Amino acid sequence: PLEIFTTRDGEVIFKKYSLIGGLEDFAAQFCDTLARSSEFTAVITDRDSVIATAGPDKRDLIGRPLTSEMEQLMDGRSIYQRSRGDAALPVCQGNDHLIAATAAPILCQGDVLGLVLFAAGEGQYPDESEYKLAQTVSSFLGKHMES
């Protein structure tokens, strides 16, 4: 879907509509809480880019477009948890040093709206707490978007 805007000069602007993008402030508060509960950078995305983040590498992620690997995780519709020996999955284009440690899709009425994920540098691996946090927050955001 597209949003259509007009400027004062009559110029028409088309912008891709992001359902979850309207929750940027709310998502930022969630990320702040998640980052305090973990040693990882907390990230919430829509289908195209990072909409909220908190933690050590926040400036390197906000607003950046997602990699094809993140798009594949969303298409898979299941929770991803990196283990030793797994290939590194960069979160954002042009930034290979931050990789997905745990990622959970945000599902709303059968559609994937984005991801809740924890990003880390090479050599950092998540545990069960990051898995459960990502799972819980993605489920909550999906339910919130349904109402």
Located regions from the model:
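Short, basic amphipathic alpha-helical segments that act as recognition/interaction helices
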Residues: 3-17
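Non-catalytic regulatory/interaction regions at protein termini and inter-domain linkers
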Residues: 2-5, 72, 109
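Structured interaction and signal-relay segments at domain junctions
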Residues: 20-22, 29-95
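Short hydrophobic/glycine-rich mini-motifs in sensory/regulatory modules
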Residues: 106-116
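A short beta-strand signature within small-molecule sensing/ligand-binding domains used
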Residues: 95-105
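Short hinge/gating elements
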Residues: 14-17, 54-57, 118-123
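Juxtadomain coupling helices with adjacent low-complexity linkers
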Residues: 24-33, 62-72, 80, 119-147
